Amino acid sequence: MSKRDYYEVLGVAKTASESELKVAFRKLAMVHHPDRNPGDKEAEIKFKEVNEAYQCLSDGQKRAAYDRFGHAAFSQGGAGGPGFGNEFGDFMSDIFENFFGDGRAAPGGGAGRGRGGAPGRERGSDLRYNLEISLEEAFAGKTETIRIPTSIACETCSGTGAKAGSKPRTCSTCGGYGRVRAAQGFFAIERTCPNCHGRGEVVDDPCTACSGAGRVNRERTLSINVPAGVDDGLRIRLAGEGESGMRGGPAGDLYVFLSIKPHPFFQRDGADLFCRVPISMVTAALSGEITVPVIDGSQTQVRIPAGTQTGKQFRIKSKGMPVLRSREVGDLYIQVSVETPQNLTKRQRELLQEFDQSASDENHPESAGFFSKVRDFFVSGATRA
């Protein structure tokens, strides 16, 4: 069967640039790769055809020979048929590693390249710990002792997984690389070694303490420094305090996620604190002093001027939360709420009625002004009608 024109195979014009050839090749390689079309012989043939066409046209000398003589340039005795040398294999390895994510080797390429360093060494998993603290603890900072279940390196075998007096041997299937290459006709695919499962080593006599895993489950006790000024949702990273790595690999990290309990008095907004304080009608009308709490456990006095209304806010400087890793401190805001008297005695009712009868608009400027505006609104509306 005659070969198809290489430009036709890649779907490009004879004047295609090097970048256009590369784009076309990558697109077709993804479509026809055997791992994406298992058992599809037609896809396998097309994949070979695409590889062959690209290797020829991406090489300046071979392309010039092909443009002049066609496929005859690579027949026996000619310039040499397309093959996959190491330099092309390296390029293909990069392409397929990016496309398929597992470091598959390219057709005819050289030795594959591992993604995790030495075969068998695995980084330990990261761990998460949720820690709830009070607002007072967030204000002052604290050292918290926590206990976490985790996996640590087996002390009996020092993490090797092998019984005392023995040691793991290099996997004979992959030669310690952790991956094997399987030839499929014109190309080769690199996969995780089925014998050692990518570890590069095999344990013939496993440690009885860890059953060959190299790690054992334990509960660890750690001290965590919670700095003053932390906020809800803050994450603290403790490097190397996660699970131990496998077979000498590095340990993972521990992430502590902080949450702050709701406070009965204070609401927080950044470094500022807000506290709602009820005051009596008499204090609001005649003035007075009230005692309010402070987050550090102390108390302070706030002067309430005569005629204070509900919602009035008083600022107390530097009585809020500290700013994390700073010398700055937020403020405390006291918002008053005037309480209406309840359960009045007969005499109290009489006194209030007497006050109401003697009161004028000057005593209630806000309500008097409001009802005056309402009256004017309806009067003007009736006039327009």
From Swiss-Prot:
UniProt-annotated binding residues for Zn(2+) 1: C154, C157, C207, C210
Location within or outside the cell: Cytoplasm
Keyword tRNA-binding: no
Domain spans labelled J: 5-70
Cofactors named for this entry: Zn(2+)
GO cellular component term, pick one: cytoplasm
Top-level division of the source organism's lineage: Bacteria
Disulfide bond sites: none
Alphabetic keyword roster: Chaperone, Cytoplasm, DNA replication, Metal-binding, Repeat, Stress response, Zinc, Zinc-finger
Residue windows of the CXXCXGXG motif repeats: 154-161, 171-178, 193-200, 207-214
GO terms, molecular function: ATP binding; heat shock protein binding; unfolded protein binding; zinc ion binding
Pfam families per the UniProt record, alphabetical: DnaJ, DnaJ_C, DnaJ_CXXCXGXG
Claim: Metal-binding is one of the keywords in the record: yes
Single biological process term from Gene Ontology: DNA replication
Cofactor-binding details, from the entry: Binds 2 Zn(2+) ions per monomer.
Zn-finger region bounds: CR-type: 141-219
Annotated positions binding Zn(2+) 2: C171, C174, C193, C196
SMART domains: DnaJ
Matching HAMAP family: DnaJ
Self-association and partners: Homodimer.
Domain text: The J domain is necessary and sufficient to stimulate DnaK ATPase activity. Zinc center 1 plays an important role in the autonomous, DnaK-independent chaperone activity of DnaJ. Zinc center 2 is essential for interaction with DnaK and for DnaJ activity.
Protein purpose: Participates actively in the response to hyperosmotic and heat shock by preventing the aggregation of stress-denatured proteins and by disaggregating proteins, also in an autonomous, DnaK-independent fashion. Unfolded proteins bind initially to DnaJ; upon interaction with the DnaJ-bound protein, DnaK hydrolyzes its bound ATP, resulting in the formation of a stable complex. GrpE releases ADP from DnaK; ATP binding to DnaK triggers the release of the substrate protein, thus completing the reaction cycle.
Family to which this protein belongs: Belongs to the DnaJ family.
Protein name: Chaperone protein DnaJ
